[in-house]
Amino acid sequence: GGFSVVQALATLGWASHRGAYFRSELIAALHILDRGAISPQGMTGSYAGAMGQPQFMPSVYLKLAVDYEGQGRPNIWTSTPDSLASIANYLRKSGWHAGEPWGEQVVLGPNIQPAGIDPDQAQPLGSWLSMGVRRLPRAPAAYASLPARLILPDGVGGDSYLVYPNFKVIRRYNPSDFYALSVGLLGDIVT
């Protein structure tokens, strides 16, 4: 976004029901400026203060941004390597398990009644398979012990997915199932 982060946070800090949160983010943004990480004019972001390519809030930048290129400070505004390394650091610190899948698309057998399945109830993969969930031919390596949840993002009749703990980590970055599915599916394509 092209909004001044300082102005956006200052406005929200006093004109929002979440004022205390935005005031603390404003203080974090001022710390970033004080460190010389970016100029006030360059510190742009969303209307809510999310900054740079990864859309980090200032407090997240201070905790997790990475100077991958070795320029002396993380540059999430114009450096793609710094941005990608910062996102990877965010996911790692949020509990990402390298080598484990985020999830997989599955086919529901005729005996499965999706309306009766609690989307918050995780079960081992083997339990889902015994209930009639079928894996697709190009599914990731099976992790029989990983807890999996069944989600139907488009409702009954739409696509079905078993999602593993790494899916929850993606949702810590953005709490939308649609966002997390998009990231997971795109990641599968590029790897």
Which functions belong to the PLM regions below?
Residues 34-49, 167-171:
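Extended, non-catalytic structural segments that build the interaction scaffolds
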Residues 5-40, 62-70, 74-77:
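Primarily short, surface-exposed interaction patches in extracytoplasmic proteins
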Residues 4, 8, 21-28, 52, ...:
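Extracytoplasmic/secreted proteins, especially bacterial periplasmic and envelope-associated proteins
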Residues 1-15, 105-108, 112:
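Short N-terminal secondary-structure initiator segments
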Residues 40, 47-52, 56-155:
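Flexible, glycine-rich surface segments
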Residues 138-191:
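C-terminal functional modules
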Residues 12-15, 29-36, 63-67, 89-97, ...:
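Structured segments of extracytoplasmic/periplasmic soluble domains
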Residues 1, 17-21, 45-53, 75-83, ...:
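Extracytoplasmic/periplasmic, Sec-exported soluble proteins
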